[in-house]
């Protein structure tokens, strides 16, 4: 979990209940900052999840507030996290495969050096581009971050869908010469 805002954790109880209804038995590990995990547990507790019959094990792994290198190493991938600048404590992520492919996810953030560190040389940067409000990044700033990090492809996520697609893409392309896409349901990269 990158941070505790409703649009990022609000469906967690539904997700866990769905797994339980499907009779999951294998343990689930949820990673995040201490403050995020504490609030996530409070959210889950509203639904009495620990008392559901035959509930599968859930473990919470706290990511250090300063970030963590390779805090997940499983299934041919390594995941690292760094703090980014949002309205609440938030982490961005870097996923590296054993084959050398790299995807970075900024999460909700203002432009900051840690986004560039996470995305350094990445194949893909998933960069939020909600606009210039505090704690967020504009499409133009997303292009600047992608260029500074030397990524191959920029995918704008968490963007304002009231703004024309051509305007969003055009703003990012002013600053980044690589491929720029808008994230959409069922997008294959």
Please tell me what each predicted stretch does.
Residues 1-105, 169-189:
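Binuclear metal-dependent hydrolase catalytic cores
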Residues 110-189:
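Cap/insert and terminal regions of metallo-dependent hydrolase folds
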């Amino acid at each position: 979990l990158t941070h505790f805002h409703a649009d990022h954790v609000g469906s967690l109880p539904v997700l866990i209940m769905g797994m339980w209804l499907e009779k999951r038995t294998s343990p689930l590990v949820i990673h995040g900052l201490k403050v995020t995990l504490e609030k996530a547990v409070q959210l889950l507790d509203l639904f009495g999840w620990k008392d559901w019959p035959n509930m599968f094990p859930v473990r919470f792994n706290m990511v250090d507030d300063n970030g963590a290198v390779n805090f997940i190493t499983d299934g041919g991938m390594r995941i690292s996290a760094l703090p980014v600048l949002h309205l609440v404590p938030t982490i961005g992520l870097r996923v590296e495969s054993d084959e050398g492919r790299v995807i970075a996810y900024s999460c909700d953030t203002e432009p900051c050096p840690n986004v560039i560190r996470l995305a350094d040389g990445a194949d893909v940067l998933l960069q939020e581009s909600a606009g210039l409000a505090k704690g967020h990044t504009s499409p133009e700033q997303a292009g600047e971050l992608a260029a500074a990090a030397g990524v191959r492809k920029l995918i704008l996520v968490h963007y304002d869908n009231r703004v024309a697609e051509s305007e969003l893409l055009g703003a990012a392309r002013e600053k980044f010469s690589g491929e720029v896409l808008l994230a959409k349901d069922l997008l294959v990269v």
